[in-house]
Amino acid sequence: MGYLNSVLSSSSQVHSDDGPVSGGGLSQNGKFSYGYASSPGKRSSMEDFYETRIDGVEGEIVGLFGVFDGHGGARAAEYVKQNLFSNLIRHPKFISDTTAAIADAYNQTDSEFLKSENSQNRDAGSTASTAILVGDRLLVANVGDSRAVICRGGNAIAVSRDHKPDQSDERQRIEDAGGFVMWAGTWRVGGVLAVSRAFGDRLLKQYVVADPEIQEEKVDSSLEFLILASDGLWDVVSNEEAVGMIKAIEDPEEGAKRLMMEAYQRGSADNITCVVVRFFSDQAGGIGSSSTNIPIDHGIVPDRISGDSST
């Protein structure tokens, strides 16, 4: 277990309302690299957070990546960023039953956030789109409308579903719980919230749950890369466009920056956060093999978008 101490790494996000930040890391055993880019975009405040983390659990090296898009302020997204993955890796079944551990960690984090805030930040909530790498397994979980897309065999494949109130099953769940969905510029829970699942949202908690949908993918030679992003990207860039834009960009940090800048240039009105994880073709043993993974964090590098006039 001694070697695990040398591989623990986490992004140290600077929450900045001033301009874009980016960074990334590389596993020394050549299994994967990752990059992130985040910008307030045209907004004057920043409610997006991200997390990139390498950790050791029961002798296994795991990668944890997430994008958290806040609403009603930044507090809920910040809390989820700080606590979700810690709760997950402490779960006693994290390795033996990862899917159950993820579901429990999501709900534990939601419950603890609501308790910690008491009656404060009653409108604060957050989406989450997360990817967990354990050996040759990739588990993607989400609540809300931050999306995960993979490139497998050259094709863009969504591996998460946006949780919107007008989806028939989501609307039925909300109505069965005593809530309602109505049109107010877009379909909203209680005429207020445009996502049907989220962390926080105390006043709507009976209807807006933090139960994640989880999808598992095998990490093999056909899996090229993963994109996690807030809706600041997906509102203006399709899954296929996003994959096509960065397919030839080997550096995932540069790929994340490319997506962020494209969304800004297309007029995205929201904060924009992207995480890209690129897998290499030799996947024998997955990322948790006995070779030591030492991420090389490039750090957070300010990189203002040309012509940025954040408002």
UniProtKB/Swiss-Prot annotation:
Alphabetical list of Pfam families matching this protein: PP2C (PF00481)
Cofactor(s) required for function per UniProt: Mg(2+); Mn(2+)
Organism expressing this protein natively: Arabidopsis thaliana
Binding site for Mn(2+) 1: 69-70
Protein name in the entry: Probable protein phosphatase 2C 59
Record-level GO BP terms: defense response to bacterium; protein dephosphorylation
Subunit text: Interacts with the Pseudomonas syringae pv. maculicola effector HopW1-1 (via C-terminus).
Family stated for the protein in its record: Belongs to the PP2C family.
CC per GO annotation: plasma membrane
Major enzyme class: hydrolase
Binding residues for Mn(2+) 2: 69, 231, 270
PANTHER family, per database record: PROTEIN PHOSPHATASE
SUPFAM superfamilies: PP2C-like
Co-factor binding details: Binds 2 magnesium or manganese ions per subunit.
